[in-house]
Amino acid sequence: MSPETAIAVSTKAVELEKALRRVIRGKDDVVRLALVSIFARGHLLIEGVPGVGKTTLGQALARAIDCTFQRVQFTSDMLPSDVLGISVYSAADQKFEFKRGPVFTNVLLADEINRTTPKTQSSLLEAMNEGQVTVDAHSYELPQPFLVIATQNPVEHHGTYPLPESQLDRFLMRVRMGYPDAQAERQILRSEAGVAHLDSLHPVLTGADVLEMQQAVKNIRVDDSLVSYALEIVRRTRESEFLSLGVSPRGSQALYRAAQAMAFLEGRNFCTPEDFKPLVVPVFAHRVVVNNLYASTLKKSEQSDQVLKEIVENVAVPV
């Protein structure tokens, strides 16, 4: 992809980012990472307390790219069929008909995904990894683009089922969506909690535009020195005395794709170290497990962030 083409295509993405920032106040970093996820063909896990705008983010993104949106509130009594769909017998036609579930959408908000059982959680694995679901030995393609934005509350642990490592590894990245600062919250109150802005949000792109951009991201050049840089960070997570579980090959692929998407959003057709460094924590933190050798006063959920930051600081940046 030529520099001119990269700039022309990424200009549309910049317009999309500006539109989302007008709705999601004070969370520019979360908006950027959500766009990195969709352009890198990945999925996003958001940790945050209720009421900070997670649902609004999903709705705004779907509306801005003129795509369908579904929200599923996960509970402990849900079944996989509540998400995927179910085959129902039709007496008139004397055959089973498949009734599609909410997963058949472009943007799926899986709200409080750790409130449901591992069986229901795992029903999303095939959808997230392969873009299809299998019910009663029949496979059904999901609409494209397909993005899962899952949320979980880091504070309320009662009655939750922590996501297993295999499920966490399917998410391109995990971000924390905390409280807005005072100025952003003032703007939210002035705009009636953002509802007016969401209602006035018009499509900036189409689903076809997003698919085109996903292909453009694949063509972003990554120098071999940057590949070595990323692999060195990955290697150190596997050898760290403070981590009982390092980053998997799927994780290293995720960082590579995310860095390409970051460069794309910056209007470049090539990656730099600055595309990789800020993504290490959001892409890797949920994939590693900190052991008891790491002495820290930080919360358990924040210790992985700190270990990764220390690893990045000690890896030489290519010039």
Positions of PLM-derived features:
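C-terminal engagement/docking regions of AAA+ P-loop ATPases
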Residues: 1-3, 7, 239-319
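Pre-Walker A (pre-P-loop) alpha-helix and adjacent loop at the N terminus of AAA/AAA+ ATPase modules
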Residues: 6-52
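Conserved alpha-helical scaffold flanking the Walker A/P-loop in AAA+ ATPase domains
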Residues: 33-36, 89-109, 138
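Walker A/P-loop
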Residues: 35-75
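Conserved beta-strand position immediately N-terminal to the Walker
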Residues: 44, 108, 146
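Walker B catalytic acidic pair
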Residues: 48, 111-112, 123
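P-loop (Walker A) phosphate-binding loop of NTP-binding proteins
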Residues: 49, 83, 151
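Canonical AAA+ ATPase core
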Residues: 90-95, 116-120, 128-220, 260-262
